Amino acid sequence: MSTSAPPRYLPLRAAAPASPDHRLSFVRRLPPGAVHKASAAEVFLTDALQVGDDRFEVAAVWHRDRFLHHDGNGRPSDPLLLVETVRQTLIHLSHHFYGIPQGHPFVLIDLEFDLDSGRRPQDSGPGPRRGGPLPVVLDVTCTRTGATPRRFGMALDAVATVDGNRFGRVRMRWEMLHPGLYALVRNRSVRPVAPRPEGALPHRLRRLDPHEVGYAHDDHVLLARDRDGACGEFWLDMKPGHPVLFDHPSDHVSGMALLEAFRQAVLAVGAPLRATVTHLSATFTTFGQLDAPVGITVQPGSNGASASNGADRPNRPLAPRTAQVTAVQGDATLVSAQVGYHLPQDLTHGEVAS
């Protein structure tokens, strides 16, 4: 008589809450493997405590002078730094508190973030700390969305604060898959598409200048433009050796690389004006192949609230402008997102300009 293997993923119960005497520590980063990183320099988390049923407090430290960094000159933090911090959080909580085995792949389904416009957490601490490492606390609530023998789904809601001041919120939904199931799902997603040329960009493509996407150097530029293409059409310029976006080997285009490309695309469409992205709601549909071109398209949406509307609520920022951004490979949509952003002329009302 044959017997089936025991279920790998059960309706797990999180570990018991920590002692009231235990306080979050910001002293030492977690081991890289705890958040699926290869380099210790790319780890933001320093501690995590359970404070209730499926409720956690997580400590992180953001360092300056790095890609995906907080700006020490008083501008709002890069939203993707917050997203990456929460991505590391969902991985660590899944392993440490919910018993998900190491080596089981995580698949991101959707995410949403909102930055509180005008909040500048790097300015809220004492003078000597400004421009230095920034201690961040996440108030996290997890919700289990389903479990089968080879699949475990969860959702997360995280509110980020510095010195008790809220500055953003992130929601994510993901699944952990048994390695065998992941291999099956991954193989099914492989599509016949034209290969990407190796080496230099094709002659018809021009890599964007760093200033078009908010950087001083071209090391971080992820977009190229067809010389005959429309304003909002770009190609992903993959950088497999990038120490942050490709910290460890992957069999697909990373979600963080695509989100950073989306942010750059919105900035490029608004150039020379510098857009500030404050909202994004993205759905991940399928895996992107590493050896085939990825097109990034920006479709402008609403222009946000008018100045007269803003005058009716002088202590609040204008509503953001919006754009629909998609990443396509062949005939498959990899990711689609609605992005909310402000241009400099929008940031002249209320607390945004303070």
Regions inferred by a protein language model and the residue ranges of each:
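Intrinsically disordered, low-complexity segments enriched in Gly and acidic/Ser/Thr residues
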Residues: 226-293
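Mixed-charge, glycine-accented linear interaction segment located at domain edges/termini
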Residues: 145-193, 316-354
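Active-site helix/loop of acyl-thioester processing domains in fatty-acid/polyketide metabolism
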Residues: 77-105, 253-275
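Non-catalytic linker/capping segments at the edges of enzyme domains
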Residues: 1-74, 175-245, 309, 352-354
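Hydrophobic beta-sheet segments that form the core/acyl-binding groove
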Residues: 111-165, 277-333
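A short glycine/small-residue-enriched secondary-structure motif
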Residues: 58-64, 102-114
